[in-house]
């Protein structure tokens, strides 16, 4: 900050106020599970191959639409061992909502598919509206409720929580780490994806 002062912030009052508002029926509690029952089948039924690739990145890495709508070759950072699953993954560097930046880890198969595409094209770019429409039609064919591409982030959060738990992280640490991977700050945000 401009005054060179150390400041600490505690936003926990927000959750307390929200909980109390819900108890008093001032806020509708209409959160529902937006994860797809079979996200792989949903992706299989997508008509556009670029949409399939974008959806795989969202499902495997938890990226938002901003992270997959436009990807350039310089965003591909190679591979590394995922310390949680001990599986080698491809690294895509993304900038998403609020300017938050970071790594998105995807399977080597998905990473190589993206890398191959970018070796023949200047950029990976999808039209968001066409992507949403493709997902909507695929959900219909797959007998799923359409939750747009954000539903794939829900699937990511649930799977990643399980992976952290298998790696002997505490519940609170699982929440926090998944929150960071999804480019959130507060651990409590992850709870919304676990409904």
Regions inferred by a protein language model and the residue ranges of each:
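Basic, Lys/Arg- and aromatic-enriched nucleic-acid-binding interface segment
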Residues: 34-65, 175
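Active-site/catalytic core of tyrosine-dependent DNA strand-transfer enzymes
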Residues: 105-162
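A short mid-domain helix/strand-loop element embedded in enzyme catalytic domains
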Residues: 14-40, 46-48
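Major-groove recognition helix of helix-turn-helix-like DNA-binding domains
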Residues: 188-195
